[in-house]
């Protein structure tokens, strides 16, 4: 159905299902306030929910079915991440698109009740849309990657539903998906799938929910900056700062002195400086024209990377961010940040989630309605229209 009848979060004209999936995906990632997982290095909920909230307006989907769809998509994203290894992301692929599109196809296939053969075709079709390079980070196209993943994931499921076929053995064959997108550290997808493990990905490898609207690699230095803010009373007495962090992260958080808010999200130096100076970090912190002190502070910050082994996993607490501050009087302060707020050790509270909703433009009266009512047996469409 290509009629323009899908309402869009954030306002604007109604769009077709394809255009709605794309725009929802772009908006979900545009301020980097999404979730992420460390196995594939993707942002699982952004493309999956962007697809589901679009489809739910033309097909009845219960909240329970929404959960199931998300879990199936997440499961496949994790399995693919395990098979490809961290090298997929390290080489330069943006897995939110390369793997996210496949997870989205699986999630949509689940809620559309495709049979096993159709779903196998859908996720294979989705590999033809696997694209997106990390070298685009710091520009608008990074958010577009999530839009592409959402849009193409739905297209893949619909093509399969209507008889479209693809090579169901594409994963492990010679010159197949794993070989081309992986490395010498990759392993066959089938080796990672045991029936006893199915459905447990979210338990074994839970997603992280961002506390601040920046790249996930910038989260730990913000924590460190907020701690240092309470310890350093006269910021102008800072002589120099060094940030030591895992070498792979520099391929992402590479902007020392950002030129705009998009680059600022991928700037360890700017995020640290802003948190240290202001004692807080929110969406306004990314308006660099109003944070001149932060920009000036970045010039005092030196970025130093350290090597990690081939077995490195993202956000492993064994490989922390280390912030070293030298004051004008020669005194030294060191903060070592190993865990991320929003992760396993410091999960977000309901009030933190509520604040994210409000920061993104949500209304408090709507939030109260959602919090005070039980929606488990209701349709996703009802909540969409409420918001």
Identify the residue ranges that each predicted region occupies.
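Alpha-helical support elements that line or immediately flank enzyme active sites
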Residues: 44-65, 102-114, 215-233, 276, ...
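Function-dense linear segments that define catalytic or interfacial modules
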Residues: 22-62, 76
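Glycine-rich, mobile lid/loop segments that gate access to catalytic sites or pores
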Residues: 57-155, 162, 167-174
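Short helix-coil transition sites and intra-membrane helix breaks within transmembrane domains
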Residues: 39-45, 93-98, 211
């Amino acid at each position: 159905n290509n009629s323009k009848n899908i309402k869009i979060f954030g306002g604007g004209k109604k769009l077709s299902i394809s255009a709605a999936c794309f725009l929802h995906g772009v908006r979900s990632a545009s301020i980097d306030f999404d979730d992420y997982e460390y196995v594939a290095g993707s942002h699982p909920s952004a493309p999956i929910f962007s697809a589901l909230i679009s489809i739910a307006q033309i097909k009845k989907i219960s909240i329970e079915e929404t959960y199931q769809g998300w879990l199936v998509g997440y499961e496949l994203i994790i399995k693919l991440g395990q098979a490809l290894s961290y090298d997929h992301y390290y080489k330069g692929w943006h897995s939110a698109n390369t793997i996210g599109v496949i997870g989205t196809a699986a999630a949509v296939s689940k809620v559309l009740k495709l049979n096993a053969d159709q779903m196998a075709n859908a996720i294979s079709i989705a590999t033809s849309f696997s694209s997106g390079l990390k070298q685009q980070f710091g520009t608008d196209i990074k958010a577009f990657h999530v839009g592409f993943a959402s849009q193409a994931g739905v297209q893949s499921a619909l093509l399969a539903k209507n008889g479209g076929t693809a090579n169901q053995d594409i994963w492990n064959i010679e010159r197949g998906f794993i070989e081309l997108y992986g490395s010498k550290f990759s392993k066959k997808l089938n080796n990672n799938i045991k029936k006893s493990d199915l459905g447990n990905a979210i338990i074994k490898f839970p997603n992280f929910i961002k506390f601040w609207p920046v790249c996930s690699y910038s989260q730990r230095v913000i924590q460190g900056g907020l701690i240092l803010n309470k310890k350093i009373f006269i910021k102008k007495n800072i002589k120099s700062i060094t940030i030591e962090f895992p070498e792979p992260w520099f391929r992402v958080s590479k902007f020392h002195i950002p030129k705009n808010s998009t680059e600022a999200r991928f700037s360890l130096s700017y995020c640290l400086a802003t948190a240290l100076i202001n004692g807080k970090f929110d969406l306004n912190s990314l308006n660099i024209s109003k944070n001149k002190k932060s920009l000036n502070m970045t010039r005092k910050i030196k970025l130093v990377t350290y090597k990690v082994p081939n077995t490195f996993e993202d956000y492993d607490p064994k490989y922390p961010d280390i912030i070293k501050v030298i004051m004008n009087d020669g005194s030294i302060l060191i903060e070592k940040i190993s865990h991320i707020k929003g992760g396993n050790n410091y999960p977000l509270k309901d009030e933190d989630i509520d604040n994210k909703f409000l920061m993104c433009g949500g209304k408090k009266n709507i939030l109260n309605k959602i919090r005070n009512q039980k929606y488990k047996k209701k349709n996703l469409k009802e909540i969409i229209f409420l918001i």
